[in-house]
A protein has these predicted regions:
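Catalytic-core segments of hydrolase enzymes
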Residues: 1-30, 94-97
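A glycine-rich, coil/turn loop motif that links secondary-structure elements
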Residues: 105-114
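Hydrolase catalytic cores
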Residues: 24-104
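Divalent metal-coordination and catalytic microenvironments
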Residues: 20, 67, 110
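Secreted peptidase-domain scaffold signal
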Residues: 116-126
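Substrate-binding/active-site groove segments that recognize
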Residues: 18, 114-115
Length: 126
């Protein structure tokens, strides 16, 4: 779901916001090490590795940034879409979103939930 304290769209001038929704509640990820010294061995680090659940728009933003980076790598670095720009990336992300029976776009989810696999699935020749 969407966090209670997340803002809702649309914008005052009726632009659709948010564009897409990304996971930001109960996302599993690594927790940063604290108090580690350079003398710590790799084994000690592995033994002390911790994962935890995190919440917040910063988590959703990081996941979205990683998704965009992978999409840009596919388009520009791997030469699949050399004309890729921010508008194209936005269109790709919207095209690949998951939509779950609600009216889209809407004030809570925008065009749907972020789904990088969905982007590539939509680009695949049918």
């Amino acid at each position: 779901g969407i966090a209670v304290d997340s803002s809702r769209g649309f914008s005052r001038d009726d632009y659709i916001k948010p564009d897409v929704a990304a996971p930001g509640i109960q996302v599993l990820g690594p927790i940063a090490f604290t108090g580690m010294t350079p003398a710590d061995t790799q084994r000690q680090r592995a033994e002390e590795a911790r994962y935890g659940m995190r919440n917040g728009s910063s988590i959703a933003a990081a996941l979205t940034a990683g998704t965009v980076a992978l999409l840009a790598e596919w388009g520009i670095v791997k030469r699949n879409d050399l004309s890729m720009d921010t508008t194209t990336i936005k269109k790709y992300l919207i095209r690949g979103t998951d939509r779950t029976g609600r009216e889209f776009p809407n004030r809570m989810w925008g065009y749907g939930f972020l789904n990088l696999y969905g982007v590539f699935d939509a680009l695949r020749p049918k």
